[in-house]
Regions:
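Proline- and acidic/polar-enriched loop/turn elements at helix boundaries
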Residues: 94-95, 158, 168, 225
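Conserved ATP-binding subdomain of kinase catalytic cores across diverse folds
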Residues: 18-118, 148, 246-247
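C-lobe/activation-segment region of protein kinase-like
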Residues: 170-247
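Active-site acidic catalytic loop and adjacent metal/ATP-binding pocket
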Residues: 38-41, 49, 141-183
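Short loop segments at secondary-structure junctions
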Residues: 113-115, 166-168, 203
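Juxta-kinase regulatory segment immediately upstream of eukaryotic protein kinase catalytic domains
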Residues: 1-28, 241, 245
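Conserved kinase catalytic-core helix
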Residues: 72, 78-88, 121-159
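Short acidic, glycine/proline-rich loop/turn micro-motifs
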Residues: 59-65, 121-125, 185-189
């Protein structure tokens, strides 16, 4: 059994979606492989990024079959929501889920490939990058717009924020890995805490907190202190987990 949804703008590549397991297996253009795997696959002149989610354990095969939406489905639905809010994310093409013996098995999310310059990691780590400060300030404005639209990306790490030039030749941003998102009102601390996973140095932290303070119209020092506390809390938690696992 399969379940799927295909964006109406891509009806001409329905065959690609329905046979994605074969196309994925026979393609060697892997761009990321960890828990999940991403490949760039061209079909009928469209460059796509196909994300194959890891088959879950037996308990979660039951959970995803009957009680919870899959990560592939949430990725697609969240992409549609973002597009409706005019927030950049690669164009969603569709998702598909495969079931065997009434259990959830493989799942895939397909989007159009976005050509980008680099991830936000580059300006955050490279102080000599051209237009660094401009990019970071625009990134803060982009994030503020997410929060203003009640969008909270729960995996807002540097590798999930793509930097590109838009049609006006201005720096712009696009978010990926969007299956874990919440749509809710975002208060000041929650908004600043959203930056913590970027693993900021002192200079970037102050610049981001200062710019965010201007946008939300609060005292800059207050904003810096809140983000510092969020940053320390996350780094301490990660360090604690490393020690528990014996990775000093």
């Amino acid at each position: 059994m399969i379940k799927y949804q295909l964006n109406k703008n891509y009806e001409n590549i329905k065959d690609f979606l329905l046979n994605i397991k074969d196309y994925f297996k026979n393609n060697s253009n892997t761009i990321h492989k960890a828990r999940n795997e991403l490949k760039v696959i061209e079909y009928k002149g469209i460059e796509t990024v196909v994300k194959a989610f890891k088959v879950p354990n037996i308990l979660n095969q039951i959970v995803y079959a009957y009680f919870r939406d899959s990560k592939a489905k949430k990725s697609y639905q969240n992409a549609i929501k973002l597009k409706n809010l005019n927030i950049n994310t690669p164009k969603p093409i569709g998702y598909i889920e495969f079931y065997r013996n009434f259990l959830f098995k493989e799942s895939f999310f397909i989007s159009e490939k976005l050509d980008y310059l680099f991830t936000i990691r580059e300006p955050l780590r490279n102080n000599n990058l051209k237009d660094r400060e401009e990019i970071i300030k625009k990134f803060v404005a982009f994030t503020y717009n997410l929060h203003k639209n009640c969008v909270y990306h729960k995996d807002y790490s540097a590798g999930n924020i793509l930097v590109f030039k838009n049609k006006n030749d201005e720096y712009d941003f696009s978010i990926v890995d969007i299956n874990r998102m919440e749509f809710k009102n975002i208060d000041l601390e929650t908004g600043l805490d959203n930056f913590a996973k970027l693993w900021l140095d002192e200079d970037s932290l102050k610049l981001i907190a200062t710019e965010y303070a201007k946008l939300v119209n609060i005292n800059e020092e207050k904003s810096i202190n809140i983000l510092k506390n969020c940053d320390i809390k996350l780094k301490s938690f990660v360090e604690f987990k490393r020690k528990i696992r014996g990775k000093n």
